[in-house]
């Protein structure tokens, strides 16, 4: 497999992508990493790292910046690292793309360059949350690709999320829910109530509404919401997880006695394990489900380790038959979902700034 890594995407680019790509190439000699970016900036960094032969550089002279309008910049910057990378996937010269750059531009690039899977109206970013029960995971989508959603979008997110969890995570019968402000069917908004009505007609194991706390319970494996809410939940959870660890450390340091210091030493392995559970770097990146190809959206602050793991997620998805399962399940869902718009206007509707 050949994997594209956007060398210019992210807060720590190009240093973090270059180092992450080198680490992955060394660990996976049977696969190739293609760093796409400004060769004049990438080459000096590679010279210090002595990269293996299965890592190559593909020059791209432009960058879609984090503060630019996503679709406008992607269309205008024809030689951007993100656009060139997606074109390599489209042309069959690579099997997947990973980027820690502008997530809106990744969404735009996936739609405009690769297109949607048949029947998909809006792709979605799917983010994994750690579960307290059984060491499992919960998949939340959309985690930021679509601010405004229709009920059919949420229903499709559920279909894609359920298929992904089965194919990628090996859960035989994932439990699916809609995120709301209470478990009662009378709660929620017109969007969540209508989406729930659609999902009750499906063959999914739909359990109704769940609250935010249930993302971590292990009782459900797929939770759907609009991209605005999902992104707020994702970033809040990230902050809470790291904040709890920080507050615990501060409490121990403030006490400062011998007992506290001994206790801190004994707790160190547990704290390190907890940090790994809540650290986004361990998950690498979130797949963009619903495009005709594999695209992984990595955190903007991704470290080399995070990008190493994101490349691992891309490889596993490309090798695991996930795309075929997504296509099959979306096709089956046409029996109970309303007709989706087709053609260029539908694609443009899914791409915004």
Swiss-Prot record:
Assigned keywords, A-Z: Cytoplasm, Lipid biosynthesis, Lipid metabolism, Phospholipid biosynthesis, Phospholipid metabolism, Transferase
Intracellular or extracellular location(s): Cytoplasm
Pathway assignment: Lipid metabolism; phospholipid metabolism
Keyword Lipid metabolism attributed: yes
A Pfam cross-reference name: FA_synthesis
EC number: 2.3.1.274
GO cellular component: cytoplasm
Class in the EC hierarchy, top level: transferase
GO molecular function: phosphate:acyl-[acyl carrier protein] acyltransferase activity
UniProt keyword annotation of Lipid biosynthesis present: yes
SUPFAM superfamilies, A to Z: Isocitrate/Isopropylmalate dehydrogenase-like
Catalyzed reaction equations: a fatty acyl-[ACP] + phosphate = an acyl phosphate + holo-[ACP]
GO BP terms: fatty acid biosynthetic process; phospholipid biosynthetic process
InterPro entries listed in its UniProt record: FA_synthesis, Phospholipid_synth_PlsX-like
Self-association and partners: Homodimer. Probably interacts with PlsY.
Family: Belongs to the PlsX family.
PANTHER family in the cross-refs: FATTY ACID/PHOSPHOLIPID SYNTHESIS PROTEIN PLSX (PTHR30100), PHOSPHATE ACYLTRANSFERASE (PTHR30100:SF1)
NCBIfam families from the UniProt entry: plsX
Role description: Catalyzes the reversible formation of acyl-phosphate (acyl-PO(4)) from acyl-[acyl-carrier-protein] (acyl-ACP). This enzyme utilizes acyl-ACP as fatty acyl donor, but not acyl-CoA.
Name of the protein this chain belongs to: Phosphate acyltransferase
């Amino acid at each position: 497999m050949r994997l594209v890594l956007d060398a210019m995407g992210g807060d720590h680019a190009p240093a973090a992508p270059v180092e992450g790509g080198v680490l992955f190439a060394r660990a996976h000699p049977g696969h190739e990493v293609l760093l796409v970016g400004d060769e004049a900036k990438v080459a000096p960094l590679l010279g210090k790292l002595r990269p293996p032969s299965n890592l190559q550089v593909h020059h791209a002279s432009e960058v879609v910046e984090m503060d630019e309008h996503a679709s406008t910049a992607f269309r205008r910057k024809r030689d951007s690292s993100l656009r060139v990378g997606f074109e390599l996937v489209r042309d069959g010269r690579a099997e997947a793309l990973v980027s820690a750059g502008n997530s809106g531009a990744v969404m735009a690039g996936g739609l405009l360059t690769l297109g949607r899977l048949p029947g998909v109206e809006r792709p979605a970013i799917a983010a994994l949350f750690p579960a307290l029960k059984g060491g499992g995971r919960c998949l939340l989508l959309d985690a930021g690709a679509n601010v405004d959603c229709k009920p059919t979008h949420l229903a499709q997110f559920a279909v894609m999320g359920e298929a992904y969890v089965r194919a990628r995570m090996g859960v035989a019968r994932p439990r699916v829910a809609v995120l709301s402000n209470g478990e009662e069917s009378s709660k929620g908004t017109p969007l969540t109530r209508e989406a729930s009505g659609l999902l009750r007609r499906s063959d999914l194991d739909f359990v109704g509404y769940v609250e935010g706390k249930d993302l971590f319970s292990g009782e459900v494996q797929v939770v759907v919401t609009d991209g605005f809410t999902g992104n707020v939940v994702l970033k809040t959870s990230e902050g809470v997880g790291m904040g709890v660890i920080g507050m615990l450390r501060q409490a121990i340091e403030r006490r400062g006695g011998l007992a506290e210091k001994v206790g801190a030493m004994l707790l160190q392995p547990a704290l390190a394990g907890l940090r790994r559970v809540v650290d986004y770097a361990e998950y690498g990146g979130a797949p963009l489900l619903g495009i005709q190809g594999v695209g992984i959206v990595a955190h903007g602050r991704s470290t080399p380790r995070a990008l190493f793991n994101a490349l691992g997620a891309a490889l596993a998805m490309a090798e695991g038959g996930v795309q075929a399962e997504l296509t099959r399940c979306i096709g089956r869902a046409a029996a109970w979902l309303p007709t989706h718009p087709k053609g260029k206007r539908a694609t443009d509707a899914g791409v915004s700034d």
